[in-house]
């Protein structure tokens, strides 16, 4: 294990976190809020500490798989630990455990909150809270790679560990250039949504914070009723951008390079839009009697379907009051998640497709043991390692889901509350059902349960492996 390499990466993360905190500081200056100075002080401490750590240059810089996974996991933990401090210093979230929960929820783009009154926060803290979504959406190390060379070509192992999905696609030969392209696309989508929201009457502060939550698929609102208080037009704009943010960013690269035909060849994207269309239409018809018109039912249905499948977590209505069938569909969408290579969470549609294709193959092998049948995705054969990795991921995923549900049951809340609390944090969604529904929060859980849910949020965002590897004794042995 090259500890100097990992330390250097953590130092860079701290430097960038210090720079990130300038945004809430400037916001506080605009609104004349003294809380802004807390962010400035912690930002300076992060930057100076990061500079001190990176003073010593790394000899023979190289990131192997082991260093990549450890560096990514520790980077997200360090980012969250320091990111939570301003909430405590300002006194807006006095408990450090609660502040850490809120911060991890932000960076992992989960959007689960312990706050019962979001509107009590200052503009300064609301901006930081939402901006963590944008930083975590595409990945903090991917962001840093787009600016700094870090460790040269070996940074592909960092991107593999941080990027969502069963595999990572290089858009261009160099990792740094791939990171730059991804963030360019990310920034363009962000700017377009901000402009559209402002044009249709949303205040600039609201536009910025809600766009960070939409494009990063986070879901932290700045009002207690989430998105319900905005006009139908604004809700529809957010619906569109939530759905677009759940698309594999390779599709946008095809648009940039004028390869539009390639988009329609991507099986995952076709299935993604098919699920949204089918689920949205069914739910709209199912909840028709709850709203004044069919159009209103469709608006709420497609908003919530888009919000849940992309793991954004915004809400225009209390969907916990919907019929059981509609709620069950939303729970299924929680597990399915968005496309691989997007900012969305969940199990990912690509993995689901691989499993769905593997099942008939396995059944066929039972009858015809000597049959050679190749599983294909987008016309290309899926290699054995990807298939095995998907199966193992599924097993670990449900193991964590069940164990976490068991652990937080010590707080004695009902099964629906506990199961959907774990599902919503592990899949980085935010709201669940019943006690953690869209009009509730996670504040009622004990500190022990909050730590379990924090683990789930980090595990879900980092695709399980980086966080779990930290608990392997063999990892830390010096050879």
Question: Whereabouts are the PLM-identified features?
Answer:
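Membrane-proximal intracellular helices of multi-pass ion channels
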Residues: 1-479
